């Protein structure tokens, strides 16, 4: 459950290390984002010579949350961190590698690229 001012780790090799959510996209009064939701983020920590710089404002998709994902069969999948993958304006991932597991809930037309790059899909 990600809201405005939440910090997230970056799960790709775009050059950012930590980002902060500044807006949850999808409605004027939408408060929380879960796995698979697109948010607007600002880069708070970045490595030198990366594709993105500190202070840049980008889109991101949430791939892991501490809150977890409830499945239809009643099981709950939780993670140790909140993580996101940075996107460009066309909703394609900026990085070329994904670190850590992602959930099956990302399957769909938009995020199949992230699923194919991920080392593990839960």
Swiss-Prot record:
GO molecular function, one term: structural constituent of ribosome
Protein keywords: Ribonucleoprotein, Ribosomal protein, RNA-binding, rRNA-binding
SMART domains: Ribosomal_L14
Superkingdom classification of source: Bacteria
GO cellular component, one term: cytosolic large ribosomal subunit
Matching InterPro entries: Ribosomal_uL14, Ribosomal_uL14_bac-type, Ribosomal_uL14_CS, Ribosomal_uL14_sf
Any matching Pfam family: Ribosomal_L14
GO terms under biological process: translation
Subunit organization: Part of the 50S ribosomal subunit. Forms a cluster with proteins L3 and L19. In the 70S ribosome, L14 and L19 interact and together make contacts with the 16S rRNA in bridges B5 and B8.
Protein family (similarity comment): Belongs to the universal ribosomal protein uL14 family.
PANTHER family recorded: 50S/60S RIBOSOMAL PROTEIN L14/L23, LARGE RIBOSOMAL SUBUNIT PROTEIN UL14M
Function: Binds to 23S rRNA. Forms part of two intersubunit bridges in the 70S ribosome.
Protein name: Large ribosomal subunit protein uL14
Organism: Cellvibrio japonicus (strain Ueda107)
UniProt gene name: rplN
